[in-house]
Amino acid sequence: MPADLHPDLDALAPLLGTWAGQGAGEYPTIEPFEYLEEVVFSHVGKPFLVYAQKTRAVADGTPLHAETGYLRVPKPGQVELVLAHPSGITEIEVGTYSASGGVIEMEMVTTAIGMTPTAKEVTALSRSFRMVGDELSYRLRMGAVGLPLQHHLGARLRRKS
């Protein structure tokens, strides 16, 4: 456990660090695409992890997306993800986690989505994370622009530090 990590985060301590890898996205309204991703989990000694994510195009490194926020642990086995996107969207996801035998799994669904007047309509999001050793994978499902919740993104990341 890192020094000064809040004790409520002990089970999620293996997430701390920088993760990088590749993912793929699809949605009925866009062409399928691949991306490079970096995710950083850090902490400030309070009962939440700081989360920062950014992606770029595989072909030329063009920035694609970013999001930042906090992964809160209100009580053992429960998580709350609070995120802001530069596309004008904020989201709150609530769910559960389990941590055992070197495996961490999280399942979350949105309970609230905020949008600026110019943001594209997003009505639902859900995420699944799975960390095994030095590999972190996730799936993101999205309901947007009049379509129901469905697969949108998936990636496999490896620990860099």
From Swiss-Prot:
Keywords: Heme, Iron, Isomerase, Metal-binding. Binds 1 heme b group per subunit, that coordinates a highly solvent-exposed Fe(III) atom. Its cofactor is heme b. It catalyses: peroxynitrite = nitrate. Signal peptide: none annotated. InterPro entries: Calycin (IPR012674), Nb(III)_bact/plant (IPR022939), Nitrobindin (IPR045165), PeroxynitIsom (IPR054873), THAP4-like_heme-bd (IPR014878). GO terms for molecular function: heme binding; metal ion binding; peroxynitrite isomerase activity. It comes from the Bacteria. A motif (GXWXGXG) lies at residues 17-23. Gene3D superfamilies: 2.40.128.20. Heme b binds at residue 152. Pathway: Nitrogen metabolism. The keyword Isomerase applies. The keyword Amino-acid biosynthesis does not apply. Pfam families: THAP4_heme-bd. It is an enzyme of class 5 (isomerase). Its EC number is 5.99.-.-. PANTHER family: PEROXYNITRITE ISOMERASE THAP4, THAP4 PROTEIN. Heme-binding protein able to scavenge peroxynitrite and to protect free L-tyrosine against peroxynitrite-mediated nitration, by acting as a peroxynitrite isomerase that converts peroxynitrite to nitrate. Therefore, this protein likely plays a role in peroxynitrite sensing and in the detoxification of reactive nitrogen and oxygen species (RNS and ROS, respectively). Is able to bind nitric oxide (NO) in vitro, but may act as a sensor of peroxynitrite levels in vivo. Forms a 10-stranded antiparallel beta-barrel structure able to accommodate a hydrophobic ligand in its interior. In fact, this fold hosts the heme group, which is located in a wide surface cleft. Belongs to the nitrobindin family. NCBIfam families: PeroxynitIsom. Homodimer. This is Peroxynitrite isomerase 2. It comes from Mycobacterium ulcerans (strain Agy99).
